């Protein structure tokens, strides 16, 4: 699957967003090693701190189903520039994905930025930092 197809999956994932407060729909799509796709959307809460971003929704869904073979991630929102992940999502990606995992950031105008997980969060705190 090419990056454009994965971006389309993320655009479709936006439709599952629960955003009654901000109306800011974000979709994410994970490409798995076997070629399958796992989607996620952002889910808001009246207590904003409990909101879950699309990237984390997709990753937690994959992991909860025993799927840990992420090859690429696409994230899309209706923004002027390709939508950047928040700090929490960057940390979760650094924990759950290989450092060289491709991340495609996009918007509805078709702009795409390609980056890797390690480039999103240089010097990430990981499990290796906890081992002696």
Curated annotation (Swiss-Prot):
Keyword flag Zinc: yes
Keyword annotations from UniProtKB, A to Z: Hydrolase, Metal-binding, Zinc
Gene Ontology BP terms: cytidine deamination
Residues engaged in binding Zn(2+): 53, 86, 89
Enzyme active site: 55
Co-factor requirement: Zn(2+)
Domain annotation CMP/dCMP-type deaminase: ranges: 1-128
GO molecular function per UniProt: cytidine deaminase activity; identical protein binding; zinc ion binding
Enzyme class per UniProt: hydrolase
Classification via InterPro entries: APOBEC/CMP_deaminase_Zn-bd, CMP_dCMP_dom, Cyt/Deoxycyt_deaminase, Cyt_deam_tetra, Cytidine_deaminase-like
Domain of life (superkingdom): Bacteria
EC id: 3.5.4.5
Functional description taken from the UniProt entry: This enzyme scavenges exogenous and endogenous cytidine and 2'-deoxycytidine for UMP synthesis.
Record family assignment: Belongs to the cytidine and deoxycytidylate deaminase family.
Name of the protein: Cytidine deaminase
Lineage, opening ranks: Bacteria, Bacillati, Bacillota, Bacilli, Bacillales
